[in-house]
Amino acid sequence: TPENAREILANFGTNIDIVSGWFDEAFLDYRGCAALKLANDPICCSLSINHRLAFREKLKITDLYGETVMLIKRGWNKYTDAIRDELWSEHPQIKIIDVPFLNAEVFNKCESENNILIDFGNGGTVHPLLKRVPIDWDYTIPFGILHSPKPSETVSEFLEAVSKVYSK
């Protein structure tokens, strides 16, 4: 839940040391945390395994015409805001509905209403009845390990070890 996420981020170094997730600089500043960036994950979509586009290996933006696209509300991060701005200005044939947060309720709604959810990642899925499909665009979002801006010695050593592995 959003409340759980806020609680975790507010207590780095006290109740929890690290968590993985997507972020932008404004998010880190607002939440008072830091991040070790591991990758730029593609921004893609998730849709029902029964959706008319589910058989495609990659979608074009024009494939979304006439569809309802679920997108995290404006202000969550600059990367999804850029997508929203492009869809609104260049592709009015796509209906956008806001979602507050990516959670089980949103994934269930995506599947049951046969919508398309703008999602993040390199494969797999978080819902058994949804399929993640890439979109032919260049949008990505930083993914990494979120932590306290002043991590403990143990956490610092862990972050350094992970950084070495990812820099190879």
Predicted regions located by residue number:
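Central regulatory/effector-binding core of bacterial HTH transcription factors
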Residues: 1-27
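Flexible hinge/capping segments at coil-to-helix
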Residues: 30-43, 47-69, 156
